Each structure stands twice: as structure tokens, then as C-alpha cells.
């Protein structure tokens, strides 16, 4: 029973977080030597740092054609938009679904669908609030184009936010990806944009809470109309 309870709270940690947790823990030890109350504040900050870099296992649906959320967070925008020019996907608008991640969300990013990475393009920029529409254009970003088995393409864009200062991407052109596979992360608050292929409608609504690698965002085989939702 105790082991089961611990497993509920203790999750695997992304490798990027190990150095930060080590630094926080070291500073905490020094704070205890200086003044015990400061040490306990350090403990809380160390625990928060571990929590931020958590990398829990996700159960990804494996049915062909499903597109899953690439990030934990809340759907902040659904609108037509031209994918980043640096990906070379053309000037035609695609349906863009934006998932905003707060500092309390898991920041590990996962592939929305299986395919082959055909382009990876980093572009420096500003650090505006990632929930703003113009963040897609103005902010620092890293964009991926993924070619699906049927030849269609999907774009995934990691966007730095007001607090985020580092985008990590572990894939390069030619990398094969499975649906839900980890491909990077963004540190300390950010956003993920997904550009859907033509004719594919999102099956989520603005304000909906998303779980990376699990929540179905769209279905390539579905003829269902775009969903709408309301807070209850």
C-alpha cells in the first residue's frame, strides 16, 4: 500500500532536470547551515523543481490516424494560420491548435502522430506571454514538420513563453517518430502549436485540459464536425 501511494507522487524525471535538482539541493544544504528556516524554503523549491521536470509514463492510443496532444496544458487557440515559413510547407492556412503550458504542467513534449521528421527549424525571438496569439509569430520557436505514412504533413511548433528561456529538441531531419514519443521540452512555461492537415477537424475545444500523449486532438479518419464546448 505504501509503495503504491509513493508511486502516485514520485514520477520519473527528465534528464534535463537532474542538474537543476542537484543545484537546488546543494543550495538547500547551504541554507540549512546558514539558517534552518531558509533551508526548509530550499526544500520546497527543490521539490518544485523535481515536480516541474517530471516525465510520467503516458498511455498513448495506438489506433492508426489518431493525433494526440503534444503537451500538457489547456487549449488556448483554434484558428486557421499559415505554418512557419521556415518549414517550407507552403502559404496555405492550416488549422492551428495551440496548447498553453503553465509552470505547473509537465513540460515534456511528445509527437502528436507517428511519421518522419522532414524539417527542424529554430528561430530566435521575443518572450511574450505564450497565451497571446502573436506569440506564434514573435516569440522564440522551434518548428518541426512531420510527414505521415500517407504523404500528408503536420507541423508542431515549440514556442517559448514569458518565463521560458530554453527550447530543447532531441530530433533532427530524418528522425522517425511514433505517436506519443518524446521529442523535447520547454523550460518554465510555454506553448505548443499543432498545424493539422487539410480537411482534418480538431476534436477538442478552447479551454479543454490536455494530457500529452493521451488526449486525442484530432482523427485523420473522422468525418465528425469541429467540436464546441462550454465550461460547466
UniProtKB/Swiss-Prot annotation:
<keyword id="KW-0456">Lyase</keyword>
<keyword id="KW-0865">Zymogen</keyword>
<comment type="pathway">
    <text>Phospholipid metabolism; phosphatidylethanolamine biosynthesis; phosphatidylethanolamine from CDP-diacylglycerol: step 2/2.</text>
</comment>
<keyword id="KW-1208">Phospholipid metabolism</keyword>
<comment type="function">
    <text>Catalyzes the formation of phosphatidylethanolamine (PtdEtn) from phosphatidylserine (PtdSer).</text>
</comment>
<feature type="site" description="Cleavage (non-hydrolytic); by autocatalysis">
    <location>
        <begin position="189"/>
        <end position="190"/>
    </location>
</feature>
<comment type="subunit">
    <text>Heterodimer of a large membrane-associated beta subunit and a small pyruvoyl-containing alpha subunit.</text>
</comment>
<protein>
    <recommendedName>
        <fullName>Phosphatidylserine decarboxylase proenzyme</fullName>
        <ecNumber>4.1.1.65</ecNumber>
    </recommendedName>
</protein>
<keyword id="KW-0472">Membrane</keyword>
<keyword id="KW-1003">Cell membrane</keyword>
<keyword id="KW-0670">Pyruvate</keyword>
<keyword id="KW-0594">Phospholipid biosynthesis</keyword>
<dbReference type="InterPro" id="IPR003817">
    <property type="entry name" value="PS_Dcarbxylase"/>
</dbReference>
<feature type="active site" description="Schiff-base intermediate with substrate; via pyruvic acid">
    <location>
        <position position="190"/>
    </location>
</feature>
<dbReference type="GO" id="GO:0006646">
    <property type="term" value="P:phosphatidylethanolamine biosynthetic process"/>
</dbReference>
<feature type="modified residue" description="Pyruvic acid (Ser); by autocatalysis">
    <location>
        <position position="190"/>
    </location>
</feature>
<comment type="similarity">
    <text>Belongs to the phosphatidylserine decarboxylase family. PSD-A subfamily.</text>
</comment>
<keyword id="KW-0210">Decarboxylase</keyword>
<dbReference type="GO" id="GO:0004609">
    <property type="term" value="F:phosphatidylserine decarboxylase activity"/>
</dbReference>
<keyword id="KW-0443">Lipid metabolism</keyword>
<dbReference type="Pfam" id="PF02666">
    <property type="entry name" value="PS_Dcarbxylase"/>
</dbReference>
<dbReference type="GO" id="GO:0005886">
    <property type="term" value="C:plasma membrane"/>
</dbReference>
<dbReference type="InterPro" id="IPR033175">
    <property type="entry name" value="PSD-A"/>
</dbReference>
<keyword id="KW-0444">Lipid biosynthesis</keyword>
Amino acid at each position: 500500500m505504501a509503495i503504491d501511494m509513493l508511486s502516485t507522487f514520485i514520477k520519473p524525471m527528465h534528464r534535463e532536470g537532474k542538474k537543476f535538482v542537484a543545484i537546488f539541493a546543494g543550495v538547500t544544504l547551504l541554507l540549512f547551515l546558514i539558517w534552518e528556516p531558509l533551508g526548509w524554503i530550499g526544500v520546497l523549491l527543490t521539490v518544485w523543481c523535481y515536480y516541474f521536470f517530471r516525465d510520467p509514463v503516458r498511455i498513448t492510443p495506438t489506433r492508426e490516424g489518431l493525433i494526440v496532444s503534444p503537451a500538457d496544458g489547456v487549449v488556448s487557440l483554434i484558428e486557421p494560420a499559415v505554418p512557419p515559413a521556415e518549414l517550407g510547407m507552403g502559404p496555405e492556412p492550416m488549422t492551428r491548435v495551440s496548447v498553453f503550458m503553465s509552470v505547473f504542467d509537465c513540460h515534456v513534449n511528445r509527437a502528436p502522430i507517428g511519421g518522419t521528421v522532414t524539417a527542424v527549424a529554430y528561430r530566435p525571438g521575443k518572450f511574450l506571454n505564450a497565451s497571446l496569439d502573436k506569440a506564434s509569430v514573435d516569440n522564440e520557436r522551434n518548428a518541426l514538420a512531420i510527414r505521415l505514412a500517407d504523404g500528408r504533413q503536420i507541423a508542431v511548433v515549440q514556442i517559448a513563453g514569458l518565463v521560458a528561456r530554453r527550447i530543447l529538441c532531441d530530433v533532427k531531419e530524418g528522425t522517425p517518430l511514433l505517436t506519443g514519443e518524446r521529442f523535447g521540452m520547454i523550460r518554465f512555461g510555454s506553448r505548443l502549436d499543432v498545424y493539422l492537415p487539410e480537411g482534418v477537424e480538431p476534436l477538442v475545444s478552447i479551454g479543454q485540459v490536455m494530457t500529452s500523449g493521451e488526449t486525442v486532438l484530432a482523427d485523420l479518419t473522422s468525418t465528425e464536425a469541429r467540436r464546441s464546448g462550454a465550461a460547466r
